[in-house]
C-alpha cells in the first residue's frame, strides 16, 4: 500500500505496541534515521525494544539489513567464487571456544575463500576479534588490505566496528539495554565483502526460518542457517542441528545429526572456555590435529562451510575435505599466513 507521508518514529513505536508490522519502505526510513544519528536515544531505545517484544518480521529485518549495508564500509573482493562467511549471532550463552574462527582456517585450506565478519564478545568469554588478536592477527586493517588477505591467504577478518561506523549511534543504547535486539540478528546479514555464500549460526530455533528467508531476499546464493538443539549457534556435536538451506533460490529445512557423519556425540561442556587465551589454546590444538570433541566440531562446521561455499557438493564431502586440511597441516599454515600478511600490511 502506498504511503503519502514518511512514518515518524512515534508512529513506528505505536505500531510495535499494537503488534503491527512496519512496512518495508517505512522500515528503510526509520533505520536511516537510526543509522544517521537523527533519532533521539530515548526513541531509539523504545523502538528497538518494541520491535523485540512484537517480534521482528522477515520484512523488517530485511529492510534494516539493507540500510546497514548502505551505511557500511565495504571490502571489494574481485572474485566471489567460493567466497563464504562463517558467522554466528552469538548470544547463545554456551561459552565455547571460537569454533567458527577455527573453522575458517580449515575451510580456507580446503579451497574456500572466507570473509569473516565478527566483533568482540557479546555474551561469550571470547569473541572472534578477541581470539584473533590473541593469535597475533591485526584486526584493524584498511578494506583494500583485507581484500588482499582474502585473495592471498584465502581468509580475511572484518572487524565489525570498523565496517559499520554508523553503529556508534546505537552501541551505547545496546550496551545499556543489555538485552538482545534486532542488531544481534543484523550483524550476520551485513557482511562487508558481500559474501554470496554463508554458514550462519543462530541462538534460537525460530531464527532459522527467519534468517534464511532474510538471506534469500537479500540476494544470497548458497546459505545454511543452523541451530544446535542443545542451544549452540553452530552445527552441534551434542544434539541434532536444525538447518535452513537456501540453494538455487529454493529453501529447504531439515535436521542433521552428528551420527549422520559418523561423529561421536559429545557435550559442548568439553568445549567451554573462560578467556580468549584458553580459546586460543583450544583452537591451536585443533589446528595441530589433536583428536577430541573440539576437532570434531570444527570438522563438522568447516565441512558445512565448504558445502555452503560450493567447494564440496555435500556436507559429507565437505567433512572429508576439512579432515584432510587438518591432517595435512594446511589449515595451520593458513593461520601462520594470515598472521604474517596482517602484520606486513599493518606495518
UniProtKB/Swiss-Prot annotation:
UniProtKB keywords: Amino-acid biosynthesis, Aromatic amino acid biosynthesis, Glycosyltransferase, Magnesium, Metal-binding, Transferase, Tryptophan biosynthesis
Annotated residues for binding of anthranilate 2: 174
InterPro entries the UniProt entry points to: Anthranilate_Pribosyl_Tfrase (IPR005940), Glycosyl_Trfase_fam3 (IPR000312), Glycosyl_Trfase_fam3_N_dom (IPR017459), Glycosyl_Trfase_fam3_N_dom_sf (IPR036320), Nuc_phospho_transferase (IPR035902)
Residues where Mg(2+) 1 binds: 100, 234
Co-factor binding comment: Binds 2 magnesium ions per monomer.
Pathway the protein acts in: Amino-acid biosynthesis; L-tryptophan biosynthesis; L-tryptophan from chorismate: step 2/5
Protein name: Anthranilate phosphoribosyltransferase
Amino acid at each position: 500500500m502506498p504511503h503519502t507521508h514518511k512514518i515518524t518514529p512515534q508512529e513506528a513505536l505505536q505500531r510495535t505496541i499494537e503488534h503491527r508490522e512496519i512496512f518495508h519502505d517505512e522500515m528503510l526510513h526509520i533505520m536511516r534515521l537510526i543509522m544517521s544519528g537523527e533519532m533521539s536515544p530515548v526513541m531509539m531505545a523504545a523502538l528497538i525494544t518494541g520491535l523485540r517484544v512484537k517480534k521482528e518480521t522477515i520484512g523488517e529485518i530485511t529492510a534494516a539489513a539493507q540500510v546497514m549495508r548502505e551505511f557500511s564500509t565495504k571490502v571489494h573482493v574481485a572474485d566471489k567464487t567460493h567466497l563464504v562467511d562463517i558467522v554466528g549471532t552469538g548470544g547463545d550463552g554456551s561459552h565455547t571456544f571460537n569454533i567458527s574462527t577455527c573453522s575458517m582456517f580449515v575451510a580456507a585450506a580446503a579451497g574456500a575463500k572466507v570473509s569473516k565478519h565478527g566483533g568482540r564478545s557479546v555474551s561469550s568469554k571470547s569473541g572472534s576479534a578477541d581470539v584473533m588478536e590473541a593469535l597475533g592477527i591485526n584486526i584493524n586493517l584498511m578494506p583494500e588490505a583485507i581484500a588482499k588477505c582474502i585473495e592471498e591467504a584465502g581468509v580475511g577478518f572484518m572487524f565489525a566496528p570498523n565496517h559499520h561506523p554508523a553503529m556508534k549511534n546505537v552501541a551505547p543504547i545496546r550496551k545499556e539495554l543489555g538485552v538482545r535486539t534486532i542488531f544481534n540478528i543484523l550483524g550476520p546479514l551485513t557482511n562487508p565483502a558481500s559474501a554470496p555464500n554463508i554458514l550462519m549460526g543462530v541462538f534460537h530455533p525460530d531464527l532459522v526460518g527467519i534468517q534464511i528467508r532474510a538471506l534469500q531476499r537479500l540476494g544470497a546464493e548458497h546459505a545454511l542457517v543452523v541451530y544446535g538443539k542443545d542451544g549452540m549457534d553452530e552445527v552441534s556435536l551434542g544434539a541434532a542441528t536444525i538447518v535452513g538451506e537456501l540453494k538455487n533460490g529454493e529453501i529447504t529445512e531439515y535436521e542433521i545429526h552428528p551420527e549422520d557423519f559418523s561423529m561421536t556425540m559429545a557435550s559442548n561442556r568439553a568445549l567451554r572456555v573462560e578467556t580468549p587465551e584458553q580459546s586460543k589454546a583450544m583452537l591451536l590444538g585443533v589446528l595441530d590435529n589433536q583428536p577430541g570433541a573440539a576437532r570434531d566440531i570444527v570438522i563438522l562446521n568447516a565441512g558445512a562451510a565448504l558445502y555452503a561455499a560450493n567447494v564440496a557438493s555435500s556436507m559429507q564431502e565437505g567433512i572429508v575435505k576439512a579432515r584432510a586440511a587438518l591432517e595435512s597441516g594446511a589449515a595451520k599454515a593458513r593461520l601462520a599466513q594470515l598472521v604474517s600478511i596482517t602484520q606486513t600490511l599493518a606495518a
